[in-house]
């Protein structure tokens, strides 16, 4: 039995090395297949113990060796397969702590960066320009607003286009569909009519009825949109209205 335990420990060591190699070679695939690996791991353990008892018979005097072998199997599972992203132990489920923390950290950093961009744009505006502009048509207003918002779009790596709301509603969002290749669902149209921002895929649509009724579209396909982007763009639109006579 002692020699068999040694063989078992040797096999455990080989499997452990294989798991480490698999993890470092393709971490994403490993995380995706982790639960299957666990099921296979314990399945092989149960089969090996069952086959051993069938061949050698049950000898309870060797319970210490069996317990040690079982502990090693569980140790490999907890120490490597589950750790550091423990998702389930004895029926108690936990979130993927490591990834969650990293995701929150990235969001906070991105939000802080967006805030700094917004502040810089506001600080660079010359107050002497306030109350000096006049827009005779909606088209003139949308072009002026678009030019003002372009500075924010360039900083975050996103395309921003301002559309006349009435024209888009009357043409089933033809302008937005042609430029951004998206279809605005009916429920989103209802939200826009209620002056609520929506997001279709990774394209944000912000309704603004400050000077004129417009839809501000942010294309975040190259750089994922943040919630802060919607707030910043709307606030910049308000700031732009100060230019009006």
Swiss-Prot record:
Belongs to the SpoIISA toxin family. One of its GO terms (cellular component) is plasma membrane. It is a multi-pass membrane protein. It is found in: Cell membrane. The chain crosses the membrane at residues 2-22, 43-63, 66-86. The keyword Transmembrane helix applies. Toxic component of a type II toxin-antitoxin (TA) system. Upon expression in E.coli growth ceases. Upon coexpression with SpoIISB in E.coli normal growth is restored. It comes from Bacillus cereus (strain ATCC 14579 / DSM 31 / CCUG 7414 / JCM 2152 / NBRC 15305 / NCIMB 9373 / NCTC 2599 / NRRL B-3711). Its main location: membrane. InterPro entries: SpoIISA_toxin. This is Stage II sporulation protein SA. Probably forms a complex with SpoIISB in which SpoIISB neutralizes the toxic activity. One of its GO terms (biological process) is sporulation resulting in formation of a cellular spore. It holds the Pfam family SpoIISA_toxin. Keywords: Cell membrane, Membrane, Sporulation, Toxin-antitoxin system, Transmembrane, Transmembrane helix.
């Amino acid at each position: 039995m002692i020699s068999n335990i040694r063989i078992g420990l040797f096999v455990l060591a080989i499997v452990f090395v294989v798991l480490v190699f698999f993890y470092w070679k393709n971490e994403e695939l490993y995380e995706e297949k982790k639960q299957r690996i666990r099921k296979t791991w314990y399945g092989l353990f149960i089969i090996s113990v069952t086959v051993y008892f069938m061949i050698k018979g049950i000898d309870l005097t060797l319970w210490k060796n069996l317990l040690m072998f079982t502990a090693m199997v569980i140790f490999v599972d907890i120490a490597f397969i589950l750790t550091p992203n423990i998702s389930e132990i004895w029926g108690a489920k936990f979130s993927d702590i490591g990834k969650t923390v990293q995701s929150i950290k990235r969001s906070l950093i991105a939000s802080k960066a967006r805030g700094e961009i917004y502040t810089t744009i506001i600080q660079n505006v010359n107050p002497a320009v306030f109350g000096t502009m006049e827009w005779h048509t909606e088209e003139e207003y949308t072009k002026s607003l678009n030019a003002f918002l372009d500075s924010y779009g360039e900083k975050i790596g996103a395309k921003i286009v301002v559309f006349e709301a009435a024209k888009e509603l009357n043409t089933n969002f033809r302008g937005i569909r042609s430029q951004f290749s998206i279809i605005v669902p009916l429920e989103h149209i209802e939200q826009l009519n209620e002056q609520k921002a929506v997001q279709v895929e990774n394209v944000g649509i912000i309704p603004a009825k400050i000077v004129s009724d417009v839809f501000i579209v942010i294309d975040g396909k190259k750089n994922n949109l943040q919630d802060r982007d919607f707030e910043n763009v709307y606030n910049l639109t308000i700031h732009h209205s100060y230019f009006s006579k």
